[in-house]
Amino acid sequence: MPQQSLKIIENSQKKLPCNIEAEQAVIGSILVSNDIYDEVSLLLDTNKFFDPIHVKIYETIEKLISKGLLANPITLKNHFENNEGLKELGGQEYLIKITKFSTSTKQAIDYANIVQEMHIRRELIKISESVLYEASSNTEAETSGDEIIQKAEKSLFDLAERGHFNQSFMK
């Protein structure tokens, strides 16, 4: 049984849970109708996205909308002209492409929930890896089993409350 647990952790390293299409649909929907951002932002912030380019796009959308400005492929163009990651995906054409994934507000919220769910699963994997690291590297009893459990409980509680855990567990 312990070998099976280690294999699960090894496999988690290979492919973290994500849904790139859901991320594209959320961002594309906001780029078509900025009003959707008001609903989606209740569920998501930049750290919920998996794809680093989507993180940057969503971050820029947040900045523009918070200033009362329009966020669409044209207004985002200047923010990403020199971004190598976006260039690899096709540059401004990528921003236009993901608007084709745009949906209704209801569907965008459903997709935002999927993005949130994938984020929670990635965070659970991080917590599991932290517990494994703490338990296996502190064999000299620097940290007691009870302390490791308390840290894990706090991390899980933080995740349940806010959708992310305090990275200090890993320190």
Residue ranges and their predicted role:
Residues 28, 165-171:
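The Walker A/P-loop phosphate-binding site
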Residues 72, 91, 144, 170-171:
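Helix N-terminus capping/helix-initiation residues
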Residues 51-52, 81, 92-165:
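Extended, charged alpha-helical coiled-coil/arm scaffolds that mediate oligomerization and mechanical coupling
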Residues 65-69, 162-167:
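Active-site phosphate-binding and catalytic loops of NTP-dependent enzymes
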Residues 1-120:
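Noncatalytic partner-interaction/assembly domains of nucleic-acid and motor enzyme complexes
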